[in-house]
Amino acid sequence: MRVKDYTNLFVLQSGPVSENETATNEICDYAVDAGLDIIVYFGDLQPKILLDKDLLWRLSWLSTAKQYWGDKFLGVYYYDEPGGNWLDYDRWSTLFEATSNTTYDDVAKVYTECTQYDEGYQQLEDNSITVFTSDYVLYWFDYLMGYDVIFAHAGWDHTLEQDIALVRGAANLQNKSWGTIITWKYNHPPYLDTPENVYEQMWTSYEAGANYVIIFNYPTYPEGNQYGVMTDEHFDALESFWNDIVKNPVVHGSVKAEAVLVLPQNYGWGMRNPEDNIWAFWEPDEKSEQIWTILQQLLTQYGTHLDIVYDDPAFPVTGNYQQIYYWNQTIT
């Protein structure tokens, strides 16, 4: 394995491989033998669906994975981008019919209770398996849904500081873990950002306290590249990042949140731009412009020293931050 001397984690996130027990085990064995921890992706674990697809082996696999691989098996990457799918693709939101009387609270309740009706998620809970996923919106609500670890997307034309503020703030107040996954910058070749920018994204994430930093290495480009989309220069950047961490162990988490922006409770706004939707059912409302304005001011002022959370009595901000800003206050 090319990266075994300068990484410690392998995420097996392949739909086709996840349908092949032998391939899954062989790849996991290979990664663990190389000294890496493993996280394994499954797109579904509901028994009825697995029976129809002849994939019931996944359930017995769950019950033995921790015993077989021990501490090297970190958990299961279950589904993918639940928040993004809800806001952008109607894959989940179509399960809920909004009416003229529907409120943000109603939709938040449906979204965060999805796992209660997912027998696959219950299988993970029953086996005390840590549950991971990645997303690019609604991190706060993904954690409320029950996920233990969220990987925030980095690499798109998002503001990395904003995504860190959202995922770290949610993880901090809800006592969860977080990370980033460096994904595509382009929907076309060369897909990944430059090695220099990928290095900076990894460093910024790690410095801000990310527990996991991952590179999404897919598909194959150019043709014949046996290492996915990563170039030799990307591997050099990854090795440099690893060596910089080893030499500077105090770097992790050295950039801490000094301030927090508190958003309205259950305000499921995508926040990627001023025109983003709210819970897939509503256009921006009267609060959106005000939130966007103060958000830009605070990101400029604090950068990665800012967290973003939601007003929720179950997770008070008082005592956790030096400076607290509310969405509807004016900054002079």
Label each residue range with its predicted role:
Residues 1-332:
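Glycan-processing catalytic domains of CAZymes
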